[in-house]
């Protein structure tokens, strides 16, 4: 079966944990408007992502891309490190 070229979702967020082997936890924040009051509020999601070379550290700003499920909670993979953390 031929593989289809589909657009995969991407997200940019901050690495909050790299304790797992080849796994990072990325906090992705987004701003949404409250449906009734109209105020802009922050919403966040923690995503598990695959880091094949263990190159990320806590505090890094990274771009991740959706992929096939790699484990129960991990269905994203690291694309690149946008900004290294200072520490």
Swiss-Prot record:
A molecular function (GO) term: rRNA binding
Pfam families cross-referenced by the UniProt entry: Ribosomal_S17
What the entry lists under InterPro entries is as follows: NA-bd_OB-fold, Ribosomal_uS17, Ribosomal_uS17_bact/chlr, Ribosomal_uS17_CS
Which terms are listed as keywords in the entry?
Answer: Ribonucleoprotein, Ribosomal protein, RNA-binding, rRNA-binding
For the keyword rRNA-binding, the answer is yes
Does rRNA-binding show up as a keyword for this record?
A: yes
- Name the GO cellular-component terms: cytosolic small ribosomal subunit
GO biological process terms, alphabetically, are:
translation
Q: How does it assemble?
A: Part of the 30S ribosomal subunit.
The name this protein goes by in its record: Small ribosomal subunit protein uS17
Organism (species): Alcanivorax borkumensis (strain ATCC 700651 / DSM 11573 / NCIMB 13689 / SK2)
What's the name of its gene?
rpsQ
């Amino acid at each position: 079966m031929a593989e289809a070229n589909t657009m995969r979702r991407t997200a940019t967020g901050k690495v909050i944990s790299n304790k797992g082997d080849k796994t990072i936890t990325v906090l992705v924040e987004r701003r949404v408007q409250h449906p009734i009051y109209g105020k802009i509020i922050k919403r966040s999601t923690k995503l598990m992502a695959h880091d094949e070379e263990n190159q990320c550290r806590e505090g890094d700003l990274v771009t991740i891309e959706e992929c096939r499920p790699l484990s129960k909670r991990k269905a994203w993979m690291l694309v690149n490190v946008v900004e290294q953390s200072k520490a």
